[in-house]
């Protein structure tokens, strides 16, 4: 079971650690924070968000707005810079209909064939 909470701006009240403490969520074992980034951000913007979002619970990156990007090199760059795995890929106007697990196959097809997960039938299959 998962609950998604869209948090306030990363600069709100001292960053994610302060926000989590304020809402009584700090120190919870099963809490995971995921940084949502767009490949349309510049490298400087993505690195800025990563610096602001760093907290004990930061577990992965979710790439969003993939359908709006003209290239996907930032996915590789941020994976290296952050040391975080990619957990999900989102594209299109719907959250649930346009979200796929970030499997190896989905990432390879996106990077090398420029295919979004919704453009082939076995997008969620691990490979």
Q: Model-found features: residue ranges?
A:
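Residues immediately C-terminal
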Residues: 10, 42, 68
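Short, solvent-exposed amphipathic alpha-helical segments in soluble enzyme
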Residues: 20-22, 50-54, 76-81, 104-105
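Conserved ATPase-coupling elements of RecA-like P-loop NTPase cores
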Residues: 12-19, 45-48, 71-74
């Amino acid at each position: 079971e998962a609950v998604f909470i869209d948090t306030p701006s990363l600069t709100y009240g001292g960053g994610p650690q302060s926000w989590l403490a304020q809402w009584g969520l700090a120190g919870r074992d099963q809490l995971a924070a995921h940084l949502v980034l767009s490949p349309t951000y510049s490298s400087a913007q993505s690195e800025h968000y990563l610096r602001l979002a760093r907290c004990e619970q930061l577990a992965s990156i979710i790439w969003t707005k993939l359908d709006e990007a003209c290239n996907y090199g930032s996915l590789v760059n941020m994976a290296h810079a952050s040391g975080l795995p990619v957990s999900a890929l989102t594209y299109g106007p719907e959250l649930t209909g346009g979200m796929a697990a970030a499997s190896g196959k989905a990432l390879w097809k996106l990077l090398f064939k420029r295919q979004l997960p919704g453009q082939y039938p076995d997008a969620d299959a691990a490979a």
